[in-house]
Amino acid sequence: MANKMQLEIGDAIKSVKAGNIDPVYVLLGNDCYLEQKFIEEVETGFFPDGAVQKSMLLPEELKESEIIDRLTAIDLFSSKQLFVLRKPSGLKGKKIKAEFLEYIENPQTEKCLIIIIDDWSDKSALVKKIKDTVGFINISTPFESKLKSWVLFMFREKGRTDISPNVVNALIEIAGDSLYHIANEIDKVCTVLKEDAQITPDDIYKFSGWKRGFQSWQFLTAVGERDLSKSVQIGHDLLARTST
């Protein structure tokens, strides 16, 4: 991945599939499906024999010095290791921050570190420096215009290729607040229906146990587009969730 830039998740996955695995990645956003998908692709590419060695580095659970020690330890056997560090802003000590930044500037090639920053509003000096040094991959839920291609991609992974636009629209309608929720709905439908069964919008509604939630930016977009009915729908949803 080129440094100091934003990379879209689809391009990042293609690069990993092509065998280009960087020693450090930064994932920015909170769509669990995209997070899991990218990590799975890295696992497959980084450990081709299937023997995955992955460790979670959580600042709230580990001593800061232990996190640095694990990253910088020299393995005499040069075995590959994958580390996933969530919420790097949890690293507080000045010395620890400096050592962490030094590592991501000069990482060990037999290790792969995936840093997850789920909050776009995190403006801490450490997070800014991390993004400036490594760049980042956007794993926020895509805008609605791009959701359709992801829905079809998920169905293809389930071996379902004959999916109508009406089915795609139904899924986005009920679960389009995140790819994670869409993936759950697709899993349910594909598990219940036989492989040769034609999936219909009625199937989506029948098996769905999810009611879509909306974000504030979607309300502002609907208002800007002068879409009254959608503005009212999203506004009611936001108010209902705020009052509960």
Predicted regions and their residues:
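Conserved beta/loop motifs at nucleotide-recognition and modification sites
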Residues: M1-T244
